[in-house]
Amino acid sequence: MSAAEIKTNTDQKMQKSLESLKSSLAKIRSGRANPGILEHIHVDYYGNPTPLSQVASLGLADARTINVQPFEKTMVAAVEKAIRDSDLGLNPASQGTVIRVPMPALTEERRRELTKVVKSEGEDTKIAVRNLRRDANEHLKRLTKDKEISEDEERRATDEIQKMTDKAVVDIDKIIVEKEKEIMTV
């Protein structure tokens, strides 16, 4: 593996870490309605646990209400039960073939708990990014030791990987601040 391949590989893994952070934060409920928080819910579809997004369309009715419309009328009760039984503390109400999921306002205490969870997720992602940097640097050192790349190439690649790490950490901080602001906005 060359230095360029190591850099490309490390950059791709760092981007995946950022995407993973974004998707895990999307599941954290803020005061506003966001169909993304329902995506991890699985519905019993003819005996098979199936993601909600595959058995129903999700949309927003207004800023605090999510509309869930099952593709089959027979699935309304199962979808409603799956949402109610989830760990989100939501109380869906069916109106014919549409299920309305109102988002209750968060208490101040709950908002603070959620910001702690968000910070923790961010720190975990930063640790993952730093571990990727460490692995890449170790790989570069091995290549230098085996005389596959020069020390100058190693130093250049190490500097570029450090810049990628710094950029990823700044991006993580931006994502965290944005999510905290979203949670704390009443």
UniProtKB/Swiss-Prot annotation:
SUPFAM superfamilies documented for this protein: Ribosome recycling factor, RRF (SSF55194)
Keywords: Cytoplasm, Protein biosynthesis
Principal localisation: cytoplasm
Subcellular compartments: Cytoplasm
A Pfam family the protein falls into: RRF
GO BP of this protein: cytoplasmic translational termination
Gene Ontology molecular-function annotations: ribosomal large subunit binding
GO cellular component: cytosol
Transmembrane parts of this sequence: none
NCBIfam families: frr
Assigned protein family: Belongs to the RRF family.
Alphabetical list of HAMAP family matching this protein: RRF
Known function: Responsible for the release of ribosomes from messenger RNA at the termination of protein biosynthesis. May increase the efficiency of translation by recycling ribosomes from one round of translation to another.
Name of the featured protein: Ribosome-recycling factor
Organism name: Polynucleobacter asymbioticus (strain DSM 18221 / CIP 109841 / QLW-P1DMWA-1)
Lineage: Bacteria, Pseudomonadati, Pseudomonadota, Betaproteobacteria, Burkholderiales
